[in-house]
């Protein structure tokens, strides 16, 4: 229904301006993108690396180029470009200039804008096939078929940097996957220390900030004349009597055993039901426990992370995606 309405709008615009179908396409895909000013925003640090592919025609490459990509691509992500036959090699690295989108007017399923191209020494398919690490990689084994939008782990990217460095290239000039620098040697003595020294720095590293993306002690009605105050509400709406939060977070000093975890879970679940939350997070000085709602919250279905785990870009990105309910 919406697609048909969109077609009607474009048709009306074309006829009102006496444009042919070809001229309308030229306007949409060439004139408008090149002449309508774009918002100049800072490129975020990369949280994920992806592979893209295809031959690069120098005549069609601009500072920012339209390219097929994974719809989950985020602005700032690293894009490793494999040029297909006859080159058959990784030749450059780009940075995503926009989030990936699904475009019904594009020949391929999804795309993004790419820029900040960095040429690197060619890493050929043959070299990858004989490399101890990449010879077992599924994308290499199928000779980069379906390359566009293939996710690369932090280990994949590190191993690729190893091969590039071996060719004498200064890999310090290449983008690095982002991991937060969480406080070291923290002194955790009370529950508030867990919140201020561990939880809030982690949320800030994901670019979520207090009173913008999350709120502490959100007052919610829990019966006639009674209010409760969950520790943190992430992606929240604090409209009185209609309070909502996509993610509910409860912090404790130390959940020493299953009984204490059970008590914290039951408390958090009661708040989550009032706020129509999709995710519950329990955290203490040692770890975070994530419960995702599948029809209901299940005490026995969870994912556990230790704070040190977030030094791994893949794990950091995995948690961010779990909490990124909008």
Question: What are these regions, as identified by a protein language model?
Answer:
Residues 1-47, 159-161, 166:
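C-terminal accessory module of base-excision DNA glycosylases/AP lyases that mediates lesion recognition
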Residues 36-46, 58-65, 103-178:
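Contiguous surface segments at macromolecular interaction interfaces
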Residues 83-89:
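Short, charged beta-turn/beta-strand-edge "cap" motif at the junction between a beta-strand
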